Amino acid sequence: MNAPQWLGAEGEKIAARHLAAKGYRIVARNYRFHRNEIDIIAFDGEALCFIEVKTRASLGKGHPAESVTRSKQKEIARAAAGYLASLDDPWITCRFDVIAVLALSIDERSIRKYEIEHIKAAFMVGDKG
């Protein structure tokens, strides 16, 4: 696993712990539908949340959430449609969230110190904005 992959995987672990501590019920991690992936799928009460996690070691290339481009949003939406097609409830409430993790202190095995921001309803499917 190269450094960016490792950093991303560590950020996803941090995000999953954050969600669990907030009472979310995680139902899938790294869900793949064709070539598209959703980092975390979890229930926040009755709402099914499709969560993209972005992790960076500095703000040199901008805030982590800024890297969730329109193209990436479309990929997430395609994977979400695949996941929803497998469910029995066609009327389930859904939400697309982004969790941004900024690693402030890293050693060879883990991110020691970080900032985390959970952006609920970060984007909407079909949103032209």
UniProtKB/Swiss-Prot annotation:
Superkingdom of the organism of origin: Bacteria
CDD domains linked to this entry: PoNe_Nuclease
An example Gene Ontology molecular-function term: nucleic acid binding
InterPro entries tied to this protein: Restrct_endonuc-II-like, tRNA_endonuc-like_dom_sf, UPF0102_YraN-like
Pfam families membership: UPF0102 (PF02021)
Family in the record: Belongs to the UPF0102 family.
Protein name: UPF0102 protein CT2262
UniProt source species: Chlorobaculum tepidum (strain ATCC 49652 / DSM 12025 / NBRC 103806 / TLS) (Chlorobium tepidum)
Lineage: Bacteria, Pseudomonadati, Chlorobiota, Chlorobiia, Chlorobiales
